[in-house]
A protein has these predicted regions:
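Conserved acetyl-CoA-binding loop-helix of GNAT-fold acetyltransferases
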Residues: 31, 37-54, 73-78
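Conserved acetyl-CoA-binding loop of GNAT-fold acetyltransferases
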Residues: 77-87
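Conserved GNAT acetyl-CoA-binding A-motif
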Residues: 52-65
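Short, small-residue-biased leader/transition segments that mark boundaries at the very start
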Residues: 1-6
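Conserved acetyl-CoA binding element of GNAT-fold acetyltransferases
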Residues: 22-34, 63
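Conserved beta-strand in the GNAT
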Residues: 7-15, 26, 30
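Conserved beta-strand-loop-alpha-helix junction that forms the acyl-donor binding cleft
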Residues: 36, 62-72, 90-95
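Glycine-rich acetyl-CoA-binding "A-motif" of GNAT/NAT acetyltransferases
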Residues: 7-10, 71, 98
Length: 108
């Protein structure tokens, strides 16, 4: 059932920084290849927004969204995230080439 699908997904929510920037959180997500296309990423990000607020964070920030990850970028924008800009060549790919990254944030 779908319950088994959810057992193979996760996210990690943590402070993006410490001290005066400690109210900004960051998250990492993992969705198994076999579970893609089931809108689980959307459920994880939505839950993360709720949990971040519940734990006293004011902003959820994604530091390194790869520019070519159009599915994630579309999802984040649909959920109300705002792109901060573009960092040219900010992500080193497995083949050694570099790709732009697009930081995003969402006020909680």
């Amino acid at each position: 059932g779908l319950g088994d699908v959810y057992k193979r997904q996760l996210y990690i929510l943590h402070p993006n920084n410490v001290g005066r920037c400690g109210h900004i959180c960051n998250a990492s997500y993992a969705v198994s290849k076999g579970s893609r296309g089931l809108h689980i990423g959307e459920k994880l990000v939505s839950d993360c927004l709720l949990e971040g607020k519940k734990h006293g964070f004011g902003v959820l920030q994604f530091n390194a969204v790869v520019a070519s990850n159009v599915h994630a970028r579309h999802l984040y924008e649909r959920l109300g995230f705002v792109q901060l800009g573009t960092i040219p060549g900010g992500f080193r790919m497995k083949d050694g080439s570099y790709e732009d990254i697009c930081p995003y944030y969402h006020v909680l």
